[in-house]
Design a protein with these regions (language model features):
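Bacterial N-terminal signal peptides
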Residues: 4-20
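Boundary at the C-terminal end of the N-terminal hydrophobic targeting segment
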Residues: 20-26
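N-terminal beta1-alpha1 ligand-phosphate binding loop
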Residues: 31-55
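Short helix-loop-beta junction
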Residues: 48-61, 146-147, 151
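Helix-loop-strand module that forms the ligand-binding subsite of alpha/beta enzymes
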Residues: 69-155
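Glycine-rich phosphate/pyrophosphate-binding loop and the adjoining helix
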Residues: 153-200
Length: 200
């Protein structure tokens, strides 16, 4: 399994290489999109990479792809948009993703300033069964974002992008990857609009 690409190696094709740590001051016009996920089987990681591809397709974006356990406070607070993916565990987000959200305060101190306020947020999920809890999982992710006063958007589906990994279509199929790319693109487009508006 390939290791996740560190911030900010994934860039739009036209963008210049930036330092190892993100520097939005050095690239004030860039919109930073963080795609983060938990994956054991590789299915959610595959979706995450497609989400990142979609975000990367929007001109003016700087995209990072990281596992939730590798995200730092700097990654989180330097981003303009955050897209979180999880496998379905008992019709909910995985424990690793829940810990990631808990760490926003326990490790990174988002309160009382609401440091994630007005950042764009979105969710994606993978699950074995067609009705095994993917929408519920995405809604729990979005609820955590709303609790932090983020601006949540959809794309690829009503609540985000999802994939059914068992049955007639094991793994991730092309339609599900296309939905993941749509989600990434939608989030990046909204983040660009918001950042442009904030400068006016």
């Amino acid at each position: 399994m390939a290791l996740p690409v560190p911030w900010p190696v994934i860039l739009c094709a036209w963008a210049l290489a930036l330092p190892a740590a993100p520097s939005l001051a050095a690239a004030p016009d860039a919109v930073a999109v963080l795609v983060t996920y938990h994956s054991l089987s590789g299915n959610t990681e595959k979706m995450a990479r497609a989400v990142a591809e979609g975000a990367q397709s929007v001109p003016g974006t700087l995209v990072a792809l990281k596992r939730v356990g590798d995200v730092t406070g700097n990654d989180l607070f330097s981003s303009d948009a955050l897209i979180v993916g999880s496998p379905v565990y008992w019709s909910n987000m995985s424990g690793e993703v829940k810990t990631f959200f808990d760490n926003w305060q326990l490790k990174f101190g988002v309160f009382p300033e609401f440091k994630m306020r007005n950042k764009v947020g979105a969710a994606f999920a993978t699950g074995g069964q067609a009705s095994g809890g993917k929408e519920v999982t995405m809604l729990t992710i979005l609820a955590a974002m709303l609790g932090n006063q983020m601006i949540v958007v959809s794309g690829g589906g009503a609540f985000g992008a999802s994939a059914t990994t068992e049955g007639d279509s094991p793994g991730i199929d092309d339609k599900e990857l296309a939905a993941a790319r749509d989600l990434g693109r939608r989030v990046a487009e909204v983040a660009v609009l918001i950042k442009r508006g904030a400068r006016k």
